[in-house]
Design a protein with these regions (language model features):
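Flexible, low-complexity segments enriched for small/polar residues
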Residues: 7, 11, 15-42, 51-191
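Active-site cores of enzymes that catalyze phosphoryl transfer or operate on phosphate-rich substrates
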Residues: 1-7
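Alpha-helical scaffolds flanking conserved acidic
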Residues: 47-49
Length: 191
């Protein structure tokens, strides 16, 4: 086992898996190579490998920012956290995760659900992801209580533009949403 753990292929395999989890489905080779070197130099110290990953400039590259897709459960939990939703019926998280394609305890492989965007994204799952967001905002999920006013210092946005800007900044803080906002506003104005 010690020989296997010290083999460069093991280091590369583990570095690739970690980088795929945290950076992108196809992580940058430079990051993986540095992580593998750290793995070998530290006798497999995962903490040091992860530090190498987050210290690498490619980890913070804007191009990689939008490459990771959350699993349905991760999406549900992050939406609940971002909106400050009070959950008194947690089974709804599992119900919605299942609607979005992640049925707990029913994936046959012992490795668990794949950590790849292609597994989670298709027409039906995208629609259910949007429906989940709409259901939270519209208070349509039993046992979920979202106070949208609290997200905007307890007052309603003064216009549709203000609402779009306020909630986009809150829910998508690191992305430039100008193009999407303009598209949405053109649709709203046309109605």
């Amino acid at each position: 086992l010690a020989m296997l753990a010290a083999h460069p292929s093991t280091a590369h395999f583990i570095a690739t898996k970690l980088a795929a989890k945290f950076i992108a489905d196809a992580p940058p080779t430079a990051v993986v190579d540095e992580m593998a070197k750290t793995f070998l130099a530290t006798n497999g110290d995962i903490k040091e490998v992860l530090l190498t990953m987050v210290m690498h400039p490619d980890f913070w590259a804007k191009a990689k920012e939008k490459e990771k897709i959350k699993s349905p459960f991760e999406l549900a939990v992050s939406a609940i956290r971002a909106t400050g939703t009070d959950v008194v019926a947690p089974y709804q998280v599992f119900t919605w995760s299942e609607k979005m394609g992640q049925k707990f305890y029913f994936y046959q492989a012992p490795t668990g659900f794949p950590d790849r965007a292609s597994f989670w994204i298709n027409t039906g799952s995208l629609l259910n992801r949007m429906n989940f967001g709409m259901a939270i905002a519209a208070q349509k999920i039993p046992g979920f209580k979202t106070n949208l006013l609290a997200l905007n210092q307890n007052h309603e946005p003064e216009s549709v533009e203000d609402a779009l800007q306020t909630y986009t900044k809150l829910l998508l803080p690191v992305s430039d949403q100008k193009e999407n906002s303009e598209r949405i506003m053109s649709i709203v104005r046309a109605q």
